[in-house]
Amino acid sequence: MAALIVSRLARRGWLWKLPLATRREFWSRSRKEKEPVVAETVEEVKKEPVLVCPPLRSRAYTPPSDLQSRLESHIKEVLGSSLPNNWQDISLDDGHMKFRLLAGLADGLGHAVPNSRLHQMCRVRDVLDFYNVPVQDKSKFDELVASNLPPNLKISWSY
């Protein structure tokens, strides 16, 4: 096929000559030439996570005596300076507010709410009830060893 094809069109008695290009030449005009892509160097900034994953085994936790005042002051930081009289009935429907509250309490008290209990934290009262329960770092077998056993019963770990 030739590079140029001359077509003759008869229009109103005139003879027109139009140069027609090949398909490749026709479509190459509309294509934009691709510019080489230059990769920019981006400096990575590493941020420390807000809440570090707790260890696999739970640590012992004893609720502090001033737990209610700590919780109230932390809620004031998260929600604002003024709290209603029934601040324990405040709903935790907002996910961001719930996260800030629980993350701050986990850092301050050293005891995090496990993932399996997060859906149960609907109100501030639920959070207060969770943090009022002491946690022991012993298994049932450790408690049996430490308890006063009868002389005919002995637990040996190495067998």
Swiss-Prot record:
Q: What is its main location?
A: mitochondrion
In terms of InterPro entries, this protein maps to: Ribosomal_m50
User: Has UniProt tagged this entry with the keyword Transcription?
Assistant: no
Mitochondrion among keywords? yes
State its location(s).
Mitochondrion
Tell me which Gene Ontology terms the entry assigns under biological process. mitochondrial translation
The Gene Ontology CC terms held by the record are: cytosol; mitochondrial inner membrane; mitochondrial large ribosomal subunit; mitochondrion
For this UniProt record, the keywords arranged alphabetically read as follows: Mitochondrion, Ribonucleoprotein, Ribosomal protein
> What interactions and quaternary structure are annotated?
Component of the mitochondrial ribosome large subunit (39S) which comprises a 16S rRNA and about 50 distinct proteins.
- To which protein family does this belong? Belongs to the mitochondrion-specific ribosomal protein mL50 family.
Any idea what this protein is called?
Answer: Large ribosomal subunit protein mL50
